[in-house]
């Protein structure tokens, strides 16, 4: 990894009515990181989100959960990245992923938005730069395109949620490896993991 990660963003929608919905998987990951590394997240209107700072393997990392709605996530990410002069290549964005089953999570750098409105807005607000890293947290697919909105905005059944939580825990552990500057090792660990019921 040439550029060390300086900012980790967890995507979701604000408010208690969305807190436990599948679309907030990215936000759960950042909250888990804050907890594991004894950080705290606080509302920061300047960056339109909850922000915090932690240290992972001696490296200083900023955390951000945008409090804008999902399709406006770029506003928050760019505000913070611009202020601290963090290039896209040093940003990791965690998000829910329809194309992976619950219990699976994968790191990736660059690529399109795959129809994800949060990623779409971030790419757009970064001036069409898609070179940031992603953590894709599998939530599964409802089967048809028409069902997607209702699916991501509802809670997963208990058994599915357990799989998502297990993959989240593994992603947090793999993040530790990521900060030894070994993306390949972190990917190998996370990509070989699949939670089972």
From Swiss-Prot:
Top-rank taxon: Bacteria
HAMAP family per record: Pept_tRNA_hydro_bact
Single GO MF descriptor: tRNA binding
Catalytic site: 23 (proton acceptor)
Catalysed reactions listed for this entry: an N-acyl-L-alpha-aminoacyl-tRNA + H2O = an N-acyl-L-amino acid + a tRNA + H(+)
EC numbers on record: 3.1.1.29
Function: Hydrolyzes ribosome-free peptidyl-tRNAs (with 1 or more amino acids incorporated), which drop off the ribosome during protein synthesis, or as a result of ribosome stalling.
Subunit relationships: Monomer.
Descriptive protein name: Peptidyl-tRNA hydrolase
UniProt-annotated site: Stabilizes the basic form of H active site to accept a proton, residues: 96
GO biological process: protein quality control for misfolded or incompletely synthesized proteins; rescue of stalled ribosome
Binding site for tRNA: 18, 69, 71, 117
Xref: NCBIfam families: pth (TIGR00447)
Species for this entry: Tolumonas auensis (strain DSM 9187 / NBRC 110442 / TA 4)
Localization terms from the record: Cytoplasm
């Amino acid at each position: 990894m040439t550029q060390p990660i300086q900012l980790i963003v967890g995507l979701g929608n604000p408010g208690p009515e969305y807190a436990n919905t599948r679309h907030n998987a990215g936000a759960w990951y950042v909250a888990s990181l804050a907890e594991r590394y004894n950080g705290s997240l606080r509302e920061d209107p300047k960056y339109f989100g909850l922000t915090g700072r932690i240290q992972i393997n001696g490296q200083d990392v900023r955390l951000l959960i945008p409090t804008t709605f999902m399709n406006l996530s770029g506003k928050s990410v760019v505000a913070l990245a611009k202020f601290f002069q963090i290039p896209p290549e040093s940003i990791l964005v965690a998000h829910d992923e329809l194309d992976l089953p619950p219990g699976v999570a994968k790191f990736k750098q660059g690529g399109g938005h795959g129809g994800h409105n949060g990623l779409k807005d971030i790419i757009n607000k970064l001036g069409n730069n898609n070179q940031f890293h992603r953590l894709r947290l599998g939530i599964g697919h409802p089967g048809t395109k028409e069902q997607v909105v209702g699916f991501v905005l509802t809670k997963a059944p208990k058994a599915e949620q357990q799989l998502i939580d297990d993959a989240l825990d593994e992603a947090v552990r793999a993040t530790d490896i990521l900060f030894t500057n070994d993306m390949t090792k972190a990917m190998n660990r996370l990509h070989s993991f699949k939670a089972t019921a």
